[in-house]
Amino acid sequence: VRIGLIQQNYLVGDLSGNREKIFRAVAEAPAGVDLFVTSELALQGYPPRDLLLYHRFVERSLEAVETLAQKLTGFAPLLLGGVEFGSAPKRLHNCAFLLHQGKVVQRFRKTLLPNYDIFDERRYFEPGQGAQSFLLDGQKIGVTICEDVWAGSPEVPFYDLNPVGELRGVDLMVNLSASPFVRGKQAKREMVLGDAARALGVPTFYANQVGGTDHLVFDGSSFALDGTGALLGRAKAFAEDLLVVDPDLAPQRIEPKLGSEEEVWRALVLGVKDYAAKCGFKTAVLGLSGGIDSALTAVIAAQALGADQVTGLLLPSPYSSPGSVADSLALAQAYGIKTTTLPIGPMMVAMDLALAPSFEGLPNDVTEENLQARIRGNLLMAFSNKFGSLLLTTGNKSELSVGYCTLYGDMSGGLAVISDLYKTEVYRLCHWLNQTQGGKIPEAILTKAPSAELRPGQTDQDSLPDYDTLDAVLHHLIEERKSAAETAAQGFDLPLVERINQLLSRAEFKRQQAAPGIKVSTQAFGGGWRMPIAASKTLF
């Protein structure tokens, strides 16, 4: 049995467009494929979120299934990811439809519904009653959907039921998946599916979605394993593909597994590219400060959209160093990004004069510093509005964690490109770009001390610990969900950890007003981080 794994980039909610895309993949495939398999919820695009709460959307989804089945008359069978109504009007099933000879031949319902991190499937779906199978050319094929194969994994120790165990006796297993990218995820997928293949002793096929959807990026990398868990084939990463594998033959096309920095780079580029395209933007604008964060964001945008579609605004104040302007211009010239320079000194004076009667007798403090950031935010938004460009924010995860950012200032924008990269990860990715990818980020940007330049001689370490320490502590508090005491036990000073933990808690109100950011870590801010705002600021 030759299996064709359809790996496509879908637009969420575009039922007719996604349907036609799937049809073309089948119609244009090479001859000899016995079964085609899409990713999970391919017809709707994953995740459809609260579109699923609209009865008419589900009705139209089912109509699209019937239409596709009819159009595929004469082609090989297709396992299609979609939804169907459940036991009650507002309960649904996440399912796979087997389409053949113009009809829906069989339905397979997802059993395990993830309800952690960015997954919220119990909000919409009710579980199926265990894994199922069907016969094709005398072969018994087991069907699972994404989470169904993760029950035995230490990654998700939540389930008593293991659908894979119910498939003993099948000749092969397929898994329709929509698994978002995080750093190192592909190795875990191949390990988990390898365990399933060995448990059943049969070839196992995994079809994944590809492309950016809001804050998520799906990396594709669909694959097939033999009954020992050895790789038979792997599709491209971060690109559409059709992987055709015959489990009776020797290993076939195996696309290379990407290194840690390259996979993050490609995830961020695809995330920006698809977010812009799917939201209707062709151009982007961002502030260029001469620092490493805006440099990396600009380089990602240039790669994603084309350098000629990116505008960098230089917004120097009286506190900006000459090097900041020069370094920004050098970066822009190296990458072909057009720039506009708008000094904000006159606007700072106007603001100070307007506020002087109210602030008389009070010393300057962070208020005046934040006014500079908000002046810049207004100018950036003006360019975004006037030219219809997507405004990219340039803050990193370290800053967003501890609130070292200004609401309605540098946080203004439509997409927070590097908000899931700690500062140390920003440096590492930039060095990787320059050393291995022919990157042209000026050395001065890589070596200067980080600074917001909101007062004379300011550096980030006036307010924060060194980034090596800060990021290590934050990783324990955020990704590993450790308490302050547990984190300090890893070799950190307890008062320092408690201070960082308090900053993390106090900044929650900022994070919940931040632009969506592209998830690349196991614990990003956004949909998978659900912390209270009006709560004790020393939670643990």
Give the residues covered by each predicted segment.
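Enzyme catalytic cores with a strong preference for nitrogen-chemistry domains
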Residues: 1-287, 303-307, 314, 334, ...
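ATP/NTP-dependent adenylation/nucleotidyl-transfer catalytic domains that generate, transfer
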Residues: 202, 227, 253-290, 294-540
